[in-house]
Amino acid sequence: MFKKTLSMICCVIFLQGCSQEQEVKKELTNMETALLAATEKNETNTVISLLKQGANINATDSQGRTPLMIATYKNDIKTAKALIDAGADVNIQDNIKNNPFLYAGAEGYLDILKLTIDAGADPALTNRYGGTALIPASEHGYITVIKELLTRTNIDVNHVNNLGWTALMEAIVLSNGDETQQQVIRLLIEHGADVNIPDNDGVTPLEHARAHNFEEIEKILVEGRK
């Protein structure tokens, strides 16, 4: 009888423990959901409050986005800073291989880019096209972003993406050849861009520039070959 009673008591204690553990997990899950929702709504103070309560700062939604990734997509500098200051991982990539550093570089979000660099962003990580942050930044002519990447990180200026394009190549092929793009080309060359790296079809940057009638860029490339 005693053994039976003791066994029943142990079972009750075990079940209570399991129930408490489930409640804790449920509470943490609810906080994660609330954290992601608060970030989506740009509610910085709520985000900070939830983090203080123990919400997982690197929780992800169905798209693999962390709170910091969501804040970056929205260019919410205040919330992004709060999350980074609290220790958010800046290198986590979502389901489409974006992370805060890569996306900020691609979209020209200089403030968030600086925050991610300060927090130890890995410049070698690549997006779904196999490109570094420098490649789309060069395509779009984001001069300040390009300078930030070239001077504050060890990003590979000659990295080749899945299309066979370097930052220099993309700055020619996908641009209109205006003064901004000419400045981009000069910057890249000044920081070691190889003007002779061809694309997957064996076409060089100079040949692309000529095909687009980008005379000024052609001159810059010829000078860069010396």
What does each model-identified segment do?
Residues 195-226:
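Leucine-rich solenoid repeat scaffolds
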Residues 37-42, 70-76, 103-109, 136-142, ...:
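Ankyrin repeat A-helix N-terminal signature
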Residues 22-70:
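N-terminal segments that cap or nucleate solenoid repeat domains
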Residues 16-17:
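C-terminal motif of bacterial Sec signal peptides marking the signal peptidase cleavage site
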Residues 43-51, 76-84, 109-118, 142-151, ...:
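Ankyrin repeat structural motif
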